[in-house]
Amino acid sequence: MTSSKNPTNDNSYFDAVLVGAGIMSSTLALLISEVLPDIKFLILEKLNAPGSESTGAFNNAGTGHAANCELNYTPLDEKGNLIIDKALSINRSFETSMSLWASLYEAGKIDIKKFLKFIPHISFVSGQDNISFLKKRFQKMTENPEFIDMEFSTSFDEISSWAPLITKDRNPSTQIAATRIDRGTDINFEALTKEYLSLVSLNKNVEIRYKTELVDLKKIDKKQWELEISSEGRKTSIRSGYVFLGAGGKTINYLQKSKIPEAKSYGGFPVSGKWLICEKKDLTEKHNSKVYGKADIGSPPMSVPHLDTRWIDNKKLLLYGPFAGFTTKFLKQSSYFDLFSSIKKNNIFSMLDVGFKNNDLINYLISQSLKNHNSRVENLKNMMPSANPSDWYLKNAGQRVQIIKKTEGGGSLKFGTEIVNSSDGSLSALLGASPGASTAVSIMVEVLEKSVLFLNDKHNLQKKINDLIYPELSVSENYSTFIKEIKKRNNSIFGFHP
């Protein structure tokens, strides 16, 4: 597809419009620019800089999600069998992201030092039942090449060597266990977004408009959308053959404005977050890992605590949390009316049903909102017994909007991401949250392949994407062999030595 589809060649028409300049839209923009360099597309961003909302370094929780240590991705079924399908899927998607970064870095197009650092990923538990679960998880996961390098230990001294702050002031007789994968990462997705858009902006067919907000959109004929946009109080209209809605929590509002039939099944449930942050060098230098615990029985998945080493603005920090809360806003910089404006005739009953069914979530959010500083630090002490309240301060994290989807019985609350596509491929929207950013490449490849942009030359464009992400590698049906080759190549390019 080329911009020749615009017969009048006027400045108000674009082959594609991407709403939002976070990690999702910037990833899609990068893919379009690399495999369809001749099409004319526009990126709209409400704020004055890219990656400032959900993608912001302090605003996203899973910075390097690969399912190495997140125990909620490997649940037990009703018979006590460990299910690792989701962990495998997330890990493979993350490796796809790593492969794209490796290709772009090798070609001199991005600087990985600005956004990627290798850091071990650790799962930590205490108590015999949790230790049994972690051992079962270790045994099951190491049967797969994705997790073959995982280590397991119940040795207090060995776990101390992995994460000394976890064991300091902890009774050595306490039953504890941990797994570790050295090849974990910390990813600054805000910095990565800026790398992507710096590269994309070199394409003369791409325009990025900041301080520009989508007001409304409607389908005006079979091949075009009309979008009303506002910039510093001035409203104008543009047209496009394809629209991607990647505006974080606000996507649900925009999707509803589109009036596509596929939008009628959805609602959103906003959740806010807060971090405990430590900048003290004597502590940050002693902790070099991301450590995930296990959620209490009956607690929602978002309650899983983690103590992370993070690098933000070239500074090493410790972040613990996130502690959840409730607000009716869908973004940090949006309106308290977001939730209310998203309630429609076709989703109100599913939203009410979710509220009635999820008392544990409601109670959890209330309890989290009522916590003071000392009670949050007491929670931290479950993972870091030596924590001192004076060493930590509180900072607001980003907004998440969990998906509410209509079902035959009412509604269901979904944790994760979901793509909504119009039947003709002219509009796509990304809803949901975790593991989002880490799997952005796989998600955006799927978005692109189902879009009208791929309509006329799908096979050739799919080959271009494979060549971009996996140069000099043949996509093999034997995934075990393929993943080993991918990891070997990526490790070599990144200079990671297991």
From Swiss-Prot:
UniProt protein name = Probable malate:quinone oxidoreductase
Q: Report the family membership.
A: Belongs to the MQO family.
Alphabetical UniProt keywords: FAD, Flavoprotein, Oxidoreductase, Tricarboxylic acid cycle
Q: Which InterPro entries match?
A: FAD/NAD-bd_sf, MQO
**Which Pfam family, any one of them, does this sequence belong to?**
Mqo
Which HAMAP family does the UniProt record give?
MQO
Instruction: Identify the cofactor(s).
Output: FAD
What's the name of its gene? mqo
Q: In which pathway does it act?
A: Carbohydrate metabolism; tricarboxylic acid cycle; oxaloacetate from (S)-malate (quinone route): step 1/1
Going by the entry's taxonomy, the superkingdom of the source organism is recorded as Bacteria
Q: Which GO terms describe its biological process?
A: tricarboxylic acid cycle
| KW Oxidoreductase (keyword) present | yes
**EC annotation?**
1.1.5.4
Reaction catalysed by this chain?
(S)-malate + a quinone = a quinol + oxaloacetate
Instruction: Name the NCBIfam families for this protein.
Output: PRK05257.2-1 (NF003606), PRK05257.2-3 (NF003607), PRK05257.3-2 (NF003611)
What does the record give under GO molecular function? 2-hydroxyglutarate dehydrogenase activity; L-malate dehydrogenase (quinone) activity
